[in-house]
């Protein structure tokens, strides 16, 4: 694949318009359009596969008659069960899904190093897209499942951070179009998140699993073709080789001139690190939406709408649509609030968000009680309630937390602290995979009540952190 990436990109590319002169794409550089289109198709493939994964594993691949065909699965199963104890097919599926969802947030750290020091961003993105396409197609074969997952994880690591960095590289540091550029970029992601479960999920559930995974692979190939077609509009690559050595030397000289960390800087770093376990608790209700919730819904939710059996994977599309709407509503609400009274700080918003988000699994706890009482199924209205309440709360947790770490981190450690912030998603998804394994052994009310309690406790702890460490984390210009 490394040779493929090298062959696909010519040594010299035609010059592209640069700076403010390039406004052909809705006032932005043409490269933004190509990068956004590529990201749309990459996210289509990613979320299409993810919508199917836990259902495919628990309902097919990890059943006794199939699991023996998977190369290397016994070693992985032994490693998981050495920590958790014996796992049923559903429990093993949830654990593997949790590990996959967690490592997705870890591998981009290595992809960034590969791009910065060895290949450059463009070649690394092409390598990542090629590996992801290969991984999606390998998912069609039972024996190659773990190889497919490895290709997907390495591919995401190579692709994700570097294509976002290329969006930023289209603009000069003082160019005020940068913020709106990332809004366009994120909008492309949201379109993909809505469409992917509808297409890949429907094919996987209604036709055959490999059709869904194949559709995801086709989406990734389209993304790769789009990226290569628009390569002349991509930003210039940072210098590698001897030039990079000069840049590193200059960077070392600049670093020597930076002031050392102050006592307050060290206190801030300590508080931000202490926050990580609380952040892990705050996301368990949201992250379970892609793991335990589809499994529970498949058994206990009436998925018939107007006489048609709605695929369980469509729940992911509902969540994507709702999360987009609630994110926009949250932004509008806080703008309205700030014009009338003082806007709360980040920890206050996050604490409020976690307390609201706890209502999502609490609603499913009630729904589980209805299931137990009636011995029947509950309507899709419970899904809409869970999604709406959870997404209102989550809109004030994840992005607000990112803003907190970006603002409060000492300037010389900002990149490191952002990376540390994302580690809570790695740990959180792994933890959620273990929690999802309890779905088979705990009553539904207790299972979802546990999640509501964990998220609510995170809300209380976030507000306690605000009370205790408000002075440490306050903005420098706070009176």
Q: What label would you give each PLM region?
A:
Residues 104, 177-205, 212-223, 319-323, ...:
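Glycine-rich segments within core transmembrane alpha-helices of 12-TM secondary carriers
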Residues 158-172, 396-409:
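Intracellular juxtamembrane helix-capping segments at the cytosolic ends
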Residues 229, 308-339, 352-361:
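Transmembrane alpha-helices of Major Facilitator/SLC transporters
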Residues 130-147, 354-375:
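C-terminal ends and interior cores of transmembrane alpha-helices
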Residues 94-113, 317-330:
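Central cavity-lining transmembrane alpha-helices of secondary-active solute carriers
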Residues 40, 135, 144-159, 373-396:
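Hydrophobic core of transmembrane alpha-helices in multi-pass small-molecule transporters
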Residues 1-31, 173-174, 201-307, 330, ...:
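Intracellular loop-helix junctions on the cytosolic face of multi-pass helical membrane proteins
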Residues 107-137:
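Conserved MFS/SLC helix-loop-helix module at the cytosolic interface between two early adjacent transmembrane helices
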């Amino acid at each position: 694949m490394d040779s493929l990436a090298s062959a696909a990109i010519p040594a010299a590319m035609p010059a592209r318009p640069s700076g403010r002169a390039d406004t052909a794409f809705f006032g932005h550089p043409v490269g933004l359009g190509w990068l956004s289109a590529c990201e749309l198709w990459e996210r289509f493939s990613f979320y299409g596969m993810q919508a199917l994964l836990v259902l495919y594993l628990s309902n097919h691949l990890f059943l006794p008659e199939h699991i023996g065909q998977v190369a290397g699965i016994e070693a992985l199963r032994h490693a998981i069960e050495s920590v958790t104890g014996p796992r049923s097919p559903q429990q093993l599926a949830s654990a593997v899904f949790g590990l996959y969802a967690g490592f997705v947030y870890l591998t981009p750290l290595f992809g960034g190093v590969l791009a910065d020091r060895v290949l450059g961003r463009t070649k690394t993105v092409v390598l990542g897209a090629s590996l992801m396409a290969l991984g999606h197609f390998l998912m069609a074969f039972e024996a190659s499942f773990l190889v497919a997952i490895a290709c997907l994880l390495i591919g995401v690591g190579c692709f994700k951070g570097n294509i976002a960095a290329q969006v930023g590289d289209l603009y000069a540091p003082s160019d005020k179009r940068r913020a709106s550029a990332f809004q366009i970029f994120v909008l492309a992601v949201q379109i993909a998140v809505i469409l992917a479960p509808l297409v890949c999920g429907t094919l996987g559930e209604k036709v055959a699993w490999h059709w869904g995974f194949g559709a995801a692979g086709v989406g990734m190939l389209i993304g790769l073709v789009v990226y290569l077609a628009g390569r002349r509009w991509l930003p210039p690559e940072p210098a590698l080789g001897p030039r990079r050595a000069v840049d590193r030397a200059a960077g070392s000289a600049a670093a020597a001139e930076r002031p050392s960390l102050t006592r307050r800087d060290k206190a801030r770093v300590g508080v931000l690190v202490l926050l990580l376990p609380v952040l892990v608790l705050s996301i368990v209700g949201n992250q379970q939406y892609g793991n335990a919730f589809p499994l529970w819904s498949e058994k206990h939710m009436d998925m018939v709408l107007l006489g048609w059996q709605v695929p369980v994977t469509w729940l992911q599309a509902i969540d994507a649509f709702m999360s987009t709407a609630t994110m926009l509503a949250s932004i509008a609400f806080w703008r309205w609030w700030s014009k009338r009274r003082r806007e709360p700080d980040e920890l206050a918003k996050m604490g409020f968000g976690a307390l609201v988000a706890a209502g999502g699994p609490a609603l499913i706890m009630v729904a589980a009680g209805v299931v137990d009482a009636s011995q029947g199924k509950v309507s899709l209205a419970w899904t809409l309630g869970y999604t709406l309440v959870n997404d209102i709360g989550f809109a004030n947790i994840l992005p607000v937390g990112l803003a907190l770490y970006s603002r409060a981190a000492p300037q010389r450690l900002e990149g490191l602290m952002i990376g540390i912030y994302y580690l809570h998603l790695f740990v959180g998804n792994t933890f959620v995979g273990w929690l999802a394994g309890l779905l088979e052994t705990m009553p539904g009310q207790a299972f979802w009540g546990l999640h509501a309690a964990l998220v609510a406790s995170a809300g209380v702890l976030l507000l306690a952190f605000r009370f205790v460490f408000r002075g440490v984390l306050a903005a420098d210009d706070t009176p």
